[in-house]
Amino acid sequence: LALLFLVLSAGSGISGPLSCRRKGGICILIRCPGPMRQIGTCFGRPVKCCRSW
């Protein structure tokens, strides 16, 4: 899990993981679970930036 986070944190651009984290989101490889909503992407379409509302 930690390795996955490091891999997902290695980009830029909300199209980058750092921007996603600054907006209070997390990068997820699948669709956003439960009460979370997609607010952007981390590495293009496959990786979503999700945040709880």
From Swiss-Prot:
GO terms for biological process: cell chemotaxis; defense response to bacterium. Disulfide bonds join 20-49, 27-42, 32-50. GO terms for molecular function: CCR6 chemokine receptor binding; chemoattractant activity. This is Beta-defensin C7. It holds the Pfam family Defensin_beta. Has bactericidal activity. The keyword Signal applies. The keyword Membrane does not apply. It is found in: Secreted. The lineage of its organism: Eukaryota, Metazoa, Chordata, Craniata, Vertebrata. Belongs to the beta-defensin family. Keywords: Antibiotic, Antimicrobial, Defensin, Disulfide bond, Secreted, Signal. One of its GO terms (cellular component) is extracellular space. InterPro entries: Beta/alpha-defensin_C, Defensin_beta-like. SUPFAM superfamilies: Defensin-like. It comes from the Eukaryota.
